[in-house]
UniProtKB/Swiss-Prot annotation:
Keyword list, A-Z: Coiled coil, Cytoplasm, Cytoskeleton, Phosphoprotein
Coiled-coil stretches noted in the UniProt entry, renumbered to this chain: 215-822, 878-959
Organism in which the protein naturally occurs: Mus musculus
Localization of this protein: Cytoplasm, Cytoskeleton, Microtubule organizing center, Centrosome, Centriole; Cytoplasm, Cytoskeleton, Spindle pole
Lineage: Eukaryota, Metazoa, Chordata, Craniata, Vertebrata
Protein name: Centrosomal protein of 128 kDa
GO biological processes: motile cilium assembly; protein localization; regulation of gene expression; sperm flagellum assembly; spermatogenesis
GO (cellular component) term, any one: ciliary basal body
Keyword rRNA-binding on entry: no
């Protein structure tokens, strides 16, 4: 357009020059000054016409731009309606799925994903989101497949992928909008450059045409001033645009931070879910292990019951043997007095048997106690495992509750931040609306001013055209007058010649001629005066035209400035609309995020309810366990030694609970500090908002000052126009006769006015449309306010729920304190029961119990109390083991005594029948001895196998005792226990010693057989002697053999293996009894064997 206008200017300038040349050629002899003035006037008129055409073109461009802006506004409204419809659909579907038990996340969808396939026509970049259908075929994909389930990790990955794709869509849309803005700015800058170039060309032409004029210099100065003002206004607009860009960047950064926080929260939730799954698997494994241990304990209990039943059967057999011996005692007492020595021996044996019976009864009672102890120990271990599991579950639940509280606090903080950002966005939106309203008002004012200026310009153009017509008519008159004057001069010359020729003839007419001549002179003077007045009028008209042209140029410049302002305002309005779109998008995103957070909070509430139900179930199980514990306490008064381990664990749990309480206090302090930080951040944000508001106020004040200046300039121009109008009216009154042509021009201008009126009506319609849009935006803003109020109510309900949770937590703390007091009471009862058990076991050794029990100061020190309880329990275990060893030794002695009694009865019967039969029986006894050897060999093999099993058990016990040794090494007062355990490690060496003893005793048995072979000739020689002496001698031999068998039994590996490993006291008592028995027997070569055995036992003790 600018190039065409410049070409038309050049052509018209040539036409004007040609016209001026023709006119000057036709006039011929005219004055040069008048010709120059007419040429300038013609050029000015041509330039004015060109400027009017250019203004018309500019008005058409403005109309097109307005239509384009209205089309864009309509498209934006349609997009907003589509977005609202899609969001309503998503909400309705989410409500349906939530009613059906499924959760739907709207966060992964955005406005760009809901446009459909129609957007592909205007795409300038490659597609990025998988949710759009960019195909031209219009194939629609399923939009509502973005349901999120927080159970599986795949759904989380899908949600993250969709969220990432929506972010990419937003970034691509931002890039597209940025490119569109850049194109629009480039187009506007290009149009500004073209207008500048056109103005420069016009100024150059005016300078070339009107170099001597001063008005052109003024116009140039004025144009330069207007350009400076335009530059300043552009700089202000650019600064404003930069500020808005910074605000948008800050908002984008805040959104990115929030998205990063949301990603971090999702990662934390995933980690927690994985940890919970691992903990579940660990709990299942522990349950399987506990089941296996329970099955093992039940099998051990069954084996112990079988052993007890076997012991009972053995006791019943022993009682039956004892009764048989009691029946046999009176029969033996009726025998002759020769058997008194034998009766004394029988009494001694009876006393030993009674003693052994009492010891066996004691051992049976101890075994029963041990059985009960083992059963109760297994049950206590089960209870302990259950308590440990429940404590672990409590710890895990407490950790989960703490994590959930932390997550809730973090999410509350995020919600507060989001609310602050929403308030900031609302404030920014309000300020944008206020600015937009101001700009609308400014646009309306500027349009009114433009209309008035166009009206004034048209009026002045009409006046200028009238003045031009008057000037042309005056020129025509002047030319006519010149022609008339020339013709009159010629006539006067002819008349003068005639008069000179006919002076005489026309003397009478001289007076008339003189009078006519005077009249003509007067007329000539009048014509000259008229010419001077016309010239003056022409000069005045030229000045007026110059002033009008300058004013016209100023008006055109002002119109151009106003058009630029309108363009800038429209661009600013477009930017504000984009910002409004962005703010709406951010509001939708924030709404989606709030919905997602509300869903997550609902899920968290469900999890909390589930956890509370689990806690109630645990409480019920704890109450049941308490009842079971009370029942067990009633039944386990004698066997409460193992509860010390429970006390240790309870103390450790108390420490852990104290640490947890400390962590809770630290967390509360951290929460308070974070709340203070949030308060400071809120104050900073408020200060920044106040600063932004101040800046906006400054900008508004600057705009108002610019408006005031503009109005002042307009008022000055109006005054100047009024003055010129008065002058023009005075001039128009003189030229009313030639107003017919002006009427035709007025009709054309009326048509233009009608066009301008139609344009004004269009502008009013646009204003009404914009007002309707503003009303719609206000309604949307009110709806957003209502939603925010609802969200605030929801947040208040959540705060009440958190308060309830804190109250429940305090109640749980009180319950924990009650449990601690109950644990302390239980520990006191356990200590009392341990002391009673120690008193019962320490009847024979009170000094040991005094050493073990220290002062009452230990109740205040839990560690020392635990150490003392452990030592007491270990002492009780040692006492039990000693008693078990005694029972075993007594059993062996009983078996030996039974065998001896049987052999004595057989020998006595054989002596009564016949000595010969006795010799045969001795031979049979030898054969029996050989069989016994074979049996002993078999028994040795069995014992070897038992030794191997015992070695395996010893290895297991060594592994178990290493742990006990590590614990006992921390207690320096109980080092004697370490020595006992070290002796226990030498059990393998004792087994080797028993094997050596067995070899020795086998050699000793061979020597005994040789002695019996030596006794055979003695028996033959004894046949000649008396039967009584033979019977006594045989009885002595039998007694010696029985003593040897008894010593062999004592030296057997079974007896040596039955010696205890952990005790040294019982071994000291057994040799004394053996010595007593050996002293009662006659010394027939058996004393050195007993001495050897005593010597070996002493070595073993050492």
């Amino acid at each position: 357009m600018a190039e065409s206008s410049s070409d038309s200017d050049h052509v018209r300038y040539r036409d004007g020059l040609s016209r001026w040349a023709t006119r000057s050629f036709q006039r011929g002899v005219g004055s040069h000054s008048t010709v120059d003035v007419t040429a300038k006037v013609n050029t000015i008129t041509n330039t004015l016409q060109d400027t009017t055409r250019n203004l018309r073109h500019v008005d058409q461009m403005l109309g097109r731009y307005r239509e384009y802006s209205t089309g864009q506004a309509g498209a934006v409204g349609q997009l907003k309606e589509d977005l609202e419809q899609s969001i309503n659909q998503l909400r309705s579907q989410r409500l349906r799925r939530s009613s059906g038990g499924r959760s739907v996340s709207v966060t992964s969808l955005s406005a760009s994903d809901l446009d459909g396939g129609a957007v592909t026509e205007n795409l300038r970049f490659a597609p990025t989101s998988p949710l759009k259908d960019y195909d031209l075929q219009g194939i629609k994909r399923n939009r509502f497949r973005t349901g999120v389930r927080f159970v599986s990790e795949t759904d989380d990955m899908v949600q993250l992928h969709t969220f990432h794709q929506s972010l990419r869509d937003l970034s691509s849309e931002q890039v597209r909008l940025g490119d569109d803005l850049n194109r629009e700015l480039f187009r506007r800058s290009r149009s500004d450059a073209e207008t500048k170039r056109v103005l420069e060309e016009l100024t150059g032409k005016l300078n070339e045409v009107q170099k001597p004029d001063v008005v052109s210099d003024r116009v140039e100065r004025r144009l330069q001033e207007i350009e400076r003002e335009m530059r300043l206004e552009r700089e202000l607009v650019e600064r404003r645009h930069d500020q808005l860009g910074l605000v948008s960047l800050k908002l984008q950064e805040a959104l990115k931070k929030q998205e990063a926080k949301a990603d971090e929260n999702e990662d934390v939730i995933k980690r927690k879910l994985r940890q919970s799954e691992t903990e579940k698997s660990q709990l299942e494994q522990e349950l399987e292990i506990s089941r296996r241990l329970l099955s093992q304990s039940e099998s051990n209990r069954e084996t112990l019951l079988h052993q007890v039943e076997e012991l009972r059967t053995q006791l019943i057999k022993a009682e039956g043997d004892q009764r048989g011996l009691q029946h046999q005692v009176p029969c033996i007492s009726k025998q002759p007095l020769s058997h008194q020595d034998d009766q004394g021996d029988d009494r001694r044996f009876r006393r030993g048997v009674e003693r052994e019976k009492l010891s066996l009864e004691k051992q049976m009672a101890d075994l029963r106690v041990q059985l009960n102890f083992n059963s109760m120990a297994s049950e206590l271990e089960e209870v302990k495992r259950c308590m440990e599991r429940k404590d672990q579950e409590k710890a895990t639940l407490a950790a989960q509750i703490e994590n959930l509280t932390r997550d809730l606090e973090n999410r509350e903080k995020q919600q507060l931040q989001m609310l602050d950002q929403l308030t900031e966005i609302q404030n920014h939106f309000e300020t944008c609306e206020a600015n937009r309203k101001r700009t609308d008002l400014q646009l309306s004012e500027l349009s009114q001013h433009a209309e008035e200026a166009t009206k004034q310009a048209e009026h002045y153009l009409s006046e200028f055209q009238r003045s031009e017509t008057l000037r042309e008519e005056a020129e025509k008159r002047r030319e006519d007058l010149k022609a008339k004057a020339q013709e009159s001069i010629r006539q006067w010359k002819l008349k003068h010649k005639k008069l000179e020729r006919s002076m005489e003839k026309q003397a009478e007419t001289l007076v008339q001629l003189t009078e006519k001549n005077n009249q003509f002179i007067k007329e000539r003077d009048e014509l000259k005066s008229q010419l001077c007045a016309a010239l003056q009028q022409i000069e005045n008209l030229r000045k007026e035209l110059n002033d009008v042209l300058s004013k016209r140029a100023l008006q055109e410049e002002e119109l151009h400035c106003k058009e630029k302002k309108l363009n800038d305002i429209e661009s600013h309005q477009a930017e504000l609309e984009l910002e409004v779109k962005n703010s709406l998008d951010t509001i939708h995103r924030l709404e989606n995020e709030l919905k997602r957070q509300s869903k997550s909070q609902s899920q968290i509430k469900a999890e909390k309810i589930h956890l509370e139900e689990e806690i109630t179930e645990l409480k019920k199980s704890q109450s049941q366990d308490k009842v079971k514990l009370l029942e067990m306490q009633e039944s386990i008064k004698d066997l409460s030694a193992i509860r010390a381990d429970l006390a240790n664990k309870l103390a450790e749990e108390e420490k852990a609970k104290k640490a947890v309480f400390r962590d809770l206090s630290e967390l509360t302090a951290q929460v308070k500090s974070k709340e203070e930080e949030t308060a400071t951040a809120i104050t900073q944000l408020k200060l920044e908002r106040d600063v932004h508001q101040r800046e906006l106020e400054d900008l508004s004040s600057s705009l108002e000052s610019v408006k005031l200046k503009h109005e002042q300039n307009i008022q000055e121009l109006m005054k100047h126009f009024k003055k010129e109008k008065s002058e023009a009216e005075s001039h128009i009154r003189m030229l009313k006769a030639e107003s017919l042509e002006d009427k035709n021009m007025a009709k054309a201008h009326l048509g233009q006015l009608e066009k301008l009126k139609s344009q004004c009506e269009k502008l009013t319609e646009e204003l009404t449309h914009t007002e309707n849009e503003n009303k719609k935006l206000k309604l949307k803003y009110q709806s957003l306010k209502e939603e925010l109020d609802k969200k605030e109510k929801y947040i208040s309900t959540e705060e009440e729920h958190l308060r309830r949770m804190e109250e429940s937590r305090l109640h749980l703390k009180d319950q924990l304190l009650c449990l601690e007091t109950e644990q302390e009471s239980i520990l006191g009862v356990i200590g009392k029961e341990i002391d009673e058990a120690c008193k019962t076991f320490s009847r024979d050794s009170l000094e040991k119990l005094k050493v073990l029990t220290s002062g009452p100061q230990l109740h205040y020190d839990p560690h020392r109390w635990l150490a003392e309880s452990k030592t007491k329990l270990q002492w009780l275990c040692e006492e039990l083991k000693e008693r078990e060893s005694r029972e075993r030794s007594m059993r062996q002695q009983l078996a030996a005594c039974r065998q001896e009694l049987r052999e004595l009865t057989e020998h006595k019967e054989s002596e009564l029948l016949c000595l010969f039969e006795h010799i045969e029986r001795q031979e049979q006894l030898l054969e029996e001895f050989h069989q016994e050897k074979r049996g002993l060999l078999e028994e040795t093999q069995r014992k070897d196998e038992e030794v191997e099993t015992l070695q395996d058990r010893v290895n297991a016990l060594q592994m178990s005792t290493r742990v006990a040794l590590d614990h006992l090494e921390s207690v320096p007062e109980k080092l004697s226990l370490l020595e006992d355990f070290k002796d226990f490690r030498g059990a393998s060496s004792l087994s080797e010693k028993t094997d050596g003893r067995y070899s020795k005793y086998s050699l000793h048995g061979d020597s005994v057989q040789q002695r019996r072979d030596d006794t055979k000739p003695r028996i033959k020689s004894f046949r000649d002697d008396r039967p009584l002496s033979a019977g006594s001698h045989a009885h002595g031999l039998d007694h010696s053999s029985s003593c040897q068998d008894h010593s062999r039994f004592l030296s057997s590996p079974q007896f040596s293996h039955s010696l205890p490993v952990f005790t040294k006291r019982t071994i000291a008592t057994d040799p004394a009894s053996i010595e007593g028995d050996t002293t009662s027997l006659p010394a027939n070569g058996t004393s050195p064997q007993s001495k050897k055995e005593e010597h070996e036992i002493k070595k073993y003790k050492k």
